[in-house]
């Protein structure tokens, strides 16, 4: 059975959305506070400008964090309970034409994999990356632009020793490190321009699996119909992986 909604019942989905709405400003303010003191390499080249632009906002972030902390703790507790009933993935389908995306009789297909580091801003900065929301949009737009160009241009012969700077035409994309739910939805909206079938928000959350923190970070993007999907959580993890529900996503197309 394919899950197109995160929960089996509508009221559970509504309660989860409300708890996420309450949590979002607290998590955002905390991330912004920590991010001030984690400048990227580009920001370190003009460190005084970085601090002069961001330090004046610190009192605002602290006010939001302190004022909403208690409601956020309650919302987090509610969200943890709801996670026990949540499906292990969401299938998003957006068809432009019912007949256009039938699986073709092809002898081969193209599959790409990519790690995109969609995490909260302060965690992305440990990888020397910033502006995660804008980066999620940019990644999706770049993939789609290259797919459209690949479809429109004639097949050129390969050049020995050539390094491609564009994404090739891809039937399927296996994405990793898409941990942030909001940024993942932004990426999904962009990719739906070409890819009608997308599985995202993959993972099971529990106290002993990931401490209700991050999902698996997996996403599967397909031009052709997804017939079945299943996710199995790894039984053991260590170090920072303890906070993400990593596992194996199995998809049939």
Segment roles from a protein language model:
Residues 229-253:
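Active-site catalytic loop in hydrolytic enzyme cores
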Residues 117, 203-204, 224, 232-235:
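Short, solvent-exposed coil/turn elements at secondary-structure transition points
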Residues 194-201:
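Eukaryotic non-catalytic protein-interaction modules, chiefly N-terminal intrinsically disordered
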Residues 176, 192, 212-229, 251-253:
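Conserved beta strand-loop-helix elements of the APE1-like EEP
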Residues 107, 214-217, 244-249:
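Residues that flank catalytic or metal-binding motifs in active/ligand-binding sites
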Residues 1-190, 203-210, 215:
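N-terminal, active-site-proximal structural segment of metallo-dependent hydrolase catalytic domains
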């Amino acid at each position: 059975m394919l899950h197109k909604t995160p929960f089996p019942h509508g009221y559970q989905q509504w309660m989860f959305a409300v708890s996420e709405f309450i949590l979002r400003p607290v998590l955002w303010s905390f991330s912004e506070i920590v991010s001030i003191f984690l400048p990227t390499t580009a920001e370190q080249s003009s460190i005084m400008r970085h601090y002069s632009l961001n330090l004046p906002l610190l009192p605002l972030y602290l006010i939001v964090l302190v004022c909403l902390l208690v409601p956020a703790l309650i919302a987090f507790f509610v969200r943890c309970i709801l996670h026990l009933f949540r499906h292990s993935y969401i299938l998003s389908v957006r068809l432009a034409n019912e007949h256009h995306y039938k699986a073709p009789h092809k002898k081969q297909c193209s599959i790409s994999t990519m790690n995109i580091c969609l995490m909260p801003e302060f965690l992305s900065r440990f990888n020397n990356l910033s502006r995660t929301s804008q980066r999620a949009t940019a990644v999706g737009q770049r993939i789609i632009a290259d797919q459209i160009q690949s479809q429109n241009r004639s097949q050129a012969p390969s050049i020995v020793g050539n390094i491609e700077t564009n994404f090739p035409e891809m039937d399927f994309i296996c994405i990793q490190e898409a941990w942030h739910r909001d940024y993942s939805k932004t990426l999904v909206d962009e990719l739906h321009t070409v890819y009608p079938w997308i599985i995202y928000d993959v993972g099971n959350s529990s106290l002993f699996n990931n401490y209700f923190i991050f999902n698996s970070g997996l996403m599967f993007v397909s031009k052709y119909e997804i017939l079945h999907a299943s996710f199995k959580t790894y039984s053991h993890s260590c170090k920072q992986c303890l906070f993400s529900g990593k596992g194996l996503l199995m998809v049939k197309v």
